[in-house]
Amino acid sequence: MAGNANSVDEEVTRILGGIYLGGIRPIIDHRPLGAEFNITHILSVIKFQVIPEYLIRKGYTLKNIPIDDDDVTDVLQYFDETNRFIDQCLFPNEVEYSPRLVDFKKKPQRGAVFAHCQAGLSRSVTFIVAYLMYRYGLSLSMAMHAVKRKKPSVEPNENFMEQLHLFEKMGGDFVDFDNPAYKQWKLKQSIKLDPSGSELVSNSGMFKDSESSQDLDKLTEAEKSKVTAVRCKKCRTKLALSTSFIAHDPPSKESSEGHFIKRAANSHRIIDIQESQANCSHFFIEPLKWMQPELQGKQELEGKFSCPGCSSKVGGYNWKGSRCSCGKWVIPAIHLQTSKVDQFPLQSTALPNMVNFESEKVNR
């Protein structure tokens, strides 16, 4: 087995088995990681101007994830790739790696990998934690504890921790890029980079069909039975499926977000406090193709959505975010108003008068 389990090294920390963590110093100093720890693979989570030549010369197997330690980088997009890289180091030549099909918890590791970033405190830690969740089925808190007990100073930034929480909600094994929470997070991150939303909506590929067969094809029959359709209350044009909804959890009544506070004009004086409503007044939703003319054409920070069938107001958007009647802030906010639409089970036979806007356009 790689390394000496009892050795203490400030630059290279053994986390579990053949998994080692550290900063850039061992790379700069050309430490013989192979001779010292039997390390054969190096995961560099850092932006190199040039990959250090000695790493190649010494025959290490390299994986470079060129990212910064910031509040906007999407690290989730790399988890499947880096987990596979670490797998192939620790458990070489396996026929199957999926943790859904095979259990390696009692399987001896046969390799050693060194994951590093600049300081070994945030970026590289994030990928090791993701691997421990993926391979050993650990919760996020357990995986963080497994790293912190060996290196207490580690502290992934808030952005990376938020994504690790998302990964945990996805099941902690593979990244689900169609997960509504992930899509909402991507929207929120894009607004951080461009508060106007113009860069986001300039990509026509981000607009989704109002009735996406791709979403439905991924569902089991039991899940399909729970899908609902939303239609304009006035003309019955189908506007969306519930598979496009972006879920939000109403805040607790005890929290400040769970109350609406009214202040006097030009003053901080509170003149009224009301509790948030139990029922939500909005369906927050992904950008849909029928919204494209409004979002791409006008490029405003906020606006209204009109039904493509009858032009009645059915919703709105605000790139800075808006507040649901339940009190929850959603950023960015793209929504349909529950008072302007009807919601029915998709598989219900009680929808004889529903108009499918997309098919109507084709037939005209």
From Swiss-Prot:
Keyword Disulfide bond: no
SUPFAM superfamilies xref list: (Phosphotyrosine protein) phosphatases II
GO molecular function, one term: protein tyrosine phosphatase activity
Principal EC category: hydrolase
Induction field: By nitrogen starvation.
Catalytic activity: O-phospho-L-tyrosyl-[protein] + H2O = L-tyrosyl-[protein] + phosphate
Modified residues (Phosphoserine): S196
Active site location: C117
Any Gene Ontology CC annotation: cytoplasmic stress granule
Highest taxon, organism lineage: Eukaryota
Domain Tyrosine-protein phosphatase: 11-173
EC id: 3.1.3.48
Other noteworthy facts: Present with 7570 molecules/cell in log phase SD medium.
Family affiliation: Belongs to the protein-tyrosine phosphatase family. Non-receptor class dual specificity subfamily.
Described function: May be directly involved in signal transduction and/or cell cycle regulation. It is necessary for maintaining growth rate or spore germination. Could show both activity toward tyrosine-protein phosphate as well as with serine-protein phosphate.
Name this polypeptide is given: Tyrosine-protein phosphatase YVH1
Organism: Saccharomyces cerevisiae (strain ATCC 204508 / S288c) (Baker's yeast)
